[in-house]
């Protein structure tokens, strides 16, 4: 069974429903096929598997949306979801649909805490999130890079100018997350 609760809807992981060993075999076969199709005699070394299949990515980019994707489970719940702003990954095959995620197993902390903080901070202040169709909204993307040294780089892409809110957000991020060494 997939470990991630967002698996199957989110576009972040695609093979979590099969064993890690099988995942790497499939990827290796795909690489071999692609390269040997062009270079017949190419020697392809086997994939070196990671010790841990989770929290291995050093960089992720999350998208903000003013109309988050609701899962079938959410739609079937009968619950009204008046707050539609969110931050997460695009639904596979949809450039304008984003699944709001609260936990991603791809990148180590403080990735989840940072994403959730920025999303919640902006919602509490009623800041506009990006709409891919109209190309309007303040918060557009959040890129987080976590180095093996523990240093963190954060880049927030703002579509609209709200200088006072931007400066307040960046100041609060720097204060709450001392591991951030670069913040833009």
Regions picked out by a protein language model, each given a short descriptive name:
Residues 1-184:
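Accessory RNA-recognition modules of RNA-modification enzymes
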